[in-house]
Amino acid sequence: MGFESSSSAASNMKPQPQKSNTAQYSVDAALFADFAQSIYTGKSFNYSKSVISPPNHVPDEHITAYLSNIQRGGLVQPFGCLIAVEEPSFRILGLSDNSSDFLGLLSLPSTSHSGEFDKVKGLIGIDARTLFTPSSGASLSKAASFTEISLLNPVLVHSRTTQKPFYAILHRIDAGIVMDLEPAKSGDPALTLAGAVQSQKLAVRAISRLQSLPGGDIGALCDTVVEDVQRLTGYDRVMVYQFHEDDHGEVVSEIRRSDLEPYLGLHYPATDIPQAARFLFKQNRVRMICDCNATPVKVVQSEELKRPLCLVNSTLRAPHGCHTQYMANMGSVASLALAIVVKGKDSSKLWGLVVGHHCSPRYVPFPLRYACEFLMQAFGLQLQMELQLASQLAEKKAMRTQTLLCDMLLRDTVSAIVTQSPGIMDLVKCDGAALYYKGKCWLVGVTPNESQVKDLVNWLVENHGDDSTGLTTDSLVDAGYPGAISLGDAVCGVAAAGFSSKDYLLWFRSNTASAIKWGGAKHHPKDKDDAGRMHPRSSFTAFLEVAKSRSLPWEISEIDAIHSLRLIMRESFTSSRPVLSGNGVARDANELTSFVCEMVRVIETATAPIFGVDSSGCINGWNKKTAEMTGLLASEAMGKSLADEIVQEESRAALESLLCKALQGEEEKSVMLKLRKFGQNNHPDYSSDVCVLVNSCTSRDYTENIIGVCFVGQDITSEKAITDRFIRLQGDYKTIVQSLNPLIPPIFASDENACCSEWNAAMEKLTGWSKHEVIGKMLPGEVFGVFCKVKCQDSLTKFLISLYQGIAGDNVPESSLVEFFNKEGKYIEASLTANKSTNIEGKVIRCFFFLQIINKESGLSCPELKESAQSLNELTYVRQEIKNPLNGIRFAHKLLESSEISASQRQFLETSDACEKQITTIIESTDLKSIEEGKLQLETEEFRLENILDTIISQVMIILRERNSQLRVEVAEEIKTLPLNGDRVKLQLILADLLRNIVNHAPFPNSWVGISISPGQELSRDNGRYIHLQFRMIHPGKGLPSEMLSDMFETRDGWVTPDGLGLKLSRKLLEQMNGRVSYVREDERCFFQVDLQVKTMLGVESRGTEGSSSIK
């Protein structure tokens, strides 16, 4: 472990994790400073005191020192050596002190001016490739030529002088390339390609075990993964840490040596794993410490570098002193930490860690660590599915409870929702609940008494009565409630929802400690550690102290459920008229009827087969395309059993699995079914069948109960016939693979080492890469990675699972997908069918993969249809409903304009008005197709730059202040008030989008963002005078993610990130305005540069009176 702290005080109904994370950085920095001071002064570090009582204010220099030490500490572990080089020359910029010893360079000639031999500094400035054999140097040059350099790791190199082998693990930093060199044993099987692939096969077997587990049990999933990691790595103890919403951690699964103390159930404060460390785990998902007692090695670097080398992604980065001290205190010498990353709503989220500890030094070779990382990626996908399923079940339960409560409100007294079952306690997890209505109080479970509830309600009315969303807090003490202490540990957290000015629903939670148990919590007299010593037991004690007077936090889904019930209650008690008039109901019924008729027409005329069954498996839907394929008319198909009368015997098990899952609410994608064909008089034709690739989709009634299953498919009969023929041919596979027949699907093959051994003509046409370019290349990383860029990490993981399952001889699920971009940037999605080829001994020597392109244009994907329709409805609703508040804002603007206001107030009003016009343009005038094609209608009006500047800055000021970041603005005085002509709102839209993305990706806290605008040459044209303007949006740090920039600048279909799509449209819009944008990375900063020619009525020298910006 290391360091971390937590807190979540009172809040409204929507949590703000960004603020708590920022505050957490300050707490972590304070602990770091305390520890560093203790080392400097020789005094003991009191861990518990520092965690329990962090300072209220942390100096900026402490935070800077903390982040710098974490990222640029200048020390590496001694089990390998590090070399940093310049690109593309490979000139050495820095290296670890032990490099000469590792590479056997003791006889290197002197390069120092003094003539004294300095075996380390003497290496700075030379070509690093000369330290290795010629073939090793060539391998390093090849790796450096690829954009995604890490995909080729590890590069096997040999020292020129000793011929010793090393794993070279490469990554890019701001200064160049960092090479972590880890010694490899000459006889190690992992040195060979076959040995490295064998590690992946071991991981795939572990993944297969994860996939075979029954759903709905996250505990079993965690238990299995710790067993698999322990089996792969051999550590004495392997645990799963889960990070909770308030950032504290918990050991939720463990496998250990029998003589070791159990940590299962241990909770520890957030400071034990700092925010900076968590950020690094998302960047570098495997972290190994070989020996915490070993003395770190210093990194020596060239004097031309302005700051220490960034070691964030270095496999050798030395652990911090407090971390090694903690490990030593718990009896651990070596550790391996593996990040568990899942997708959040907006970005990836560090859910937890799998951590191995060993009681003696332990080194795990890179190929095996890479296999563990692969296992973690697959585990993350499986965990994400389980979390989504659990969330869906919880949401459905909440909706059912809300429905029952609403029914009670309609036919019973209001107190029934507390006194009857189910009641409001069933809506969310809580220890007690209360209803305060018209001065009376109803209580259930563990609650304050009536007078205390009344006092709490009065405090809520006085202090939070204006908050339309209610109040949630995990600590009434921190929320400032005066009577919190008197409630004791029984009531610490509360969720309050007011449904009128003085009527409230309240849910209560008790102290966190009451729900937490750990077998190691009891302090034994023999134990030597005291409260101030860093140890799991003191972590647990510190956590309980930090969590004192605090309950478990309220989850967002729970807050949403409470908020929904509050709205229902408010409507029930304030509405004195029917919700809908008779005319309204009739109109809505007509609209619904029209919508249903249109959907029936779309389904019936679709070019994809669509059919459905009721809950008993009998057909109740059969469109025209399905009838054409099978020869069975809809009138004859209705009522037949899909499993017994339509589907072929070999597909019956797959269908029954689909139906079982769908009727439980779990939908599947890309499952192959074989359907019978029917001849005259509707008799089955047993000599032929049709193959469809289907997606299942649940059908529900108005109460959300599942009443059937719909299947949306794609006809793959001809492709399946070719695959079957290929299997029959067995050894004579070249007949099909080398055929130029356009009906042959894309096919590629892998040898036993995951290298490409076949790539047919259809594959060449699909990907744009010729056979000679890919044959012999590694399929993972090179072919699918460097050549065919994979859509995202999840897509790559799914492909790797299918690939290694195929070459390991395991069955590859027919629903396996591969998603990538071809050479021209076109997005490809295909299902994979695998067929292995074995030698006479039964060993797999080759595996063929057949691609079936998922044609979304010719078919209707039911889940996607639902999702698209829902998204369209949401968008239509937002665009419509936002107009009323916009009209209100516009009316308020008009009133203010006509009143007496100061000049500065008028300037703020103009900024607000410009923001309102920007929103109006987005919702009323946005035509994405016209933007893509460069045909959007541009408007013309007179404007000044200072007004645009005020407007775009106002849109990022809140986030800048939250992050404690500075804004630096440099605008040439002569152009601030220069009258310009053009589409002001669209230029404002473009600049605001660029600035927002710059702000979102600037490091924080205590960083800065810059804007500069400078004039260029004036031009004269037939239609007037123009001035060239250059805008720059600047921020320090590593820059925007490559996926986002690819979305913005590459001319491919589709997009990976929503922000990338927005930037792409901004670029297109700017190009239509005869402007251009570029993104520039420099050593210390990155920036967007916009060059634009704007029409002006006056020259720069004859500008009007200067103004000043209202935002500084």
Swiss-Prot record:
<dbReference type="InterPro" id="IPR035965">
    <property type="entry name" value="PAS-like_dom_sf"/>
</dbReference>
<dbReference type="GO" id="GO:0006355">
    <property type="term" value="P:regulation of DNA-templated transcription"/>
</dbReference>
<feature type="domain" description="PAS 1">
    <location>
        <begin position="595"/>
        <end position="666"/>
    </location>
</feature>
<feature type="binding site" description="covalent">
    <location>
        <position position="322"/>
    </location>
    <ligand>
        <name>phytochromobilin</name>
    </ligand>
</feature>
<dbReference type="InterPro" id="IPR003661">
    <property type="entry name" value="HisK_dim/P_dom"/>
</dbReference>
<dbReference type="InterPro" id="IPR001294">
    <property type="entry name" value="Phytochrome"/>
</dbReference>
<feature type="domain" description="Histidine kinase">
    <location>
        <begin position="877"/>
        <end position="1096"/>
    </location>
</feature>
<dbReference type="Pfam" id="PF00989">
    <property type="entry name" value="PAS"/>
</dbReference>
<keyword id="KW-0677">Repeat</keyword>
<comment type="function">
    <text>Regulatory photoreceptor which exists in two forms that are reversibly interconvertible by light: the Pr form that absorbs maximally in the red region of the spectrum and the Pfr form that absorbs maximally in the far-red region. Photoconversion of Pr to Pfr induces an array of morphogenic responses, whereas reconversion of Pfr to Pr cancels the induction of those responses. Pfr controls the expression of a number of nuclear genes including those encoding the small subunit of ribulose-bisphosphate carboxylase, chlorophyll A/B binding protein, protochlorophyllide reductase, rRNA, etc.</text>
</comment>
<dbReference type="GO" id="GO:0000155">
    <property type="term" value="F:phosphorelay sensor kinase activity"/>
</dbReference>
<dbReference type="InterPro" id="IPR013515">
    <property type="entry name" value="Phytochrome_cen-reg"/>
</dbReference>
<dbReference type="InterPro" id="IPR005467">
    <property type="entry name" value="His_kinase_dom"/>
</dbReference>
<dbReference type="Pfam" id="PF02518">
    <property type="entry name" value="HATPase_c"/>
</dbReference>
<dbReference type="GO" id="GO:0009584">
    <property type="term" value="P:detection of visible light"/>
</dbReference>
<dbReference type="InterPro" id="IPR000014">
    <property type="entry name" value="PAS"/>
</dbReference>
<dbReference type="InterPro" id="IPR013654">
    <property type="entry name" value="PAS_2"/>
</dbReference>
<dbReference type="Pfam" id="PF08446">
    <property type="entry name" value="PAS_2"/>
</dbReference>
<dbReference type="InterPro" id="IPR012129">
    <property type="entry name" value="Phytochrome_A-E"/>
</dbReference>
<feature type="region of interest" description="Disordered">
    <location>
        <begin position="1"/>
        <end position="20"/>
    </location>
</feature>
<dbReference type="InterPro" id="IPR003018">
    <property type="entry name" value="GAF"/>
</dbReference>
<dbReference type="InterPro" id="IPR044767">
    <property type="entry name" value="Phy_HATPase-like"/>
</dbReference>
<dbReference type="Pfam" id="PF00512">
    <property type="entry name" value="HisKA"/>
</dbReference>
<feature type="domain" description="PAS 2">
    <location>
        <begin position="732"/>
        <end position="803"/>
    </location>
</feature>
<keyword id="KW-0805">Transcription regulation</keyword>
<dbReference type="GO" id="GO:0009881">
    <property type="term" value="F:photoreceptor activity"/>
</dbReference>
<dbReference type="InterPro" id="IPR029016">
    <property type="entry name" value="GAF-like_dom_sf"/>
</dbReference>
<dbReference type="GO" id="GO:0009585">
    <property type="term" value="P:red, far-red light phototransduction"/>
</dbReference>
<dbReference type="Pfam" id="PF00360">
    <property type="entry name" value="PHY"/>
</dbReference>
<keyword id="KW-0675">Receptor</keyword>
<dbReference type="InterPro" id="IPR036890">
    <property type="entry name" value="HATPase_C_sf"/>
</dbReference>
<dbReference type="GO" id="GO:0043231">
    <property type="term" value="C:intracellular membrane-bounded organelle"/>
</dbReference>
<keyword id="KW-0716">Sensory transduction</keyword>
<keyword id="KW-0600">Photoreceptor protein</keyword>
<dbReference type="GO" id="GO:0042803">
    <property type="term" value="F:protein homodimerization activity"/>
</dbReference>
<feature type="domain" description="GAF">
    <location>
        <begin position="217"/>
        <end position="387"/>
    </location>
</feature>
<keyword id="KW-0157">Chromophore</keyword>
<keyword id="KW-0804">Transcription</keyword>
<dbReference type="InterPro" id="IPR013516">
    <property type="entry name" value="Phyto_chromo_BS"/>
</dbReference>
<dbReference type="Pfam" id="PF01590">
    <property type="entry name" value="GAF"/>
</dbReference>
<dbReference type="InterPro" id="IPR043150">
    <property type="entry name" value="Phytochrome_PHY_sf"/>
</dbReference>
<dbReference type="InterPro" id="IPR016132">
    <property type="entry name" value="Phyto_chromo_attachment"/>
</dbReference>
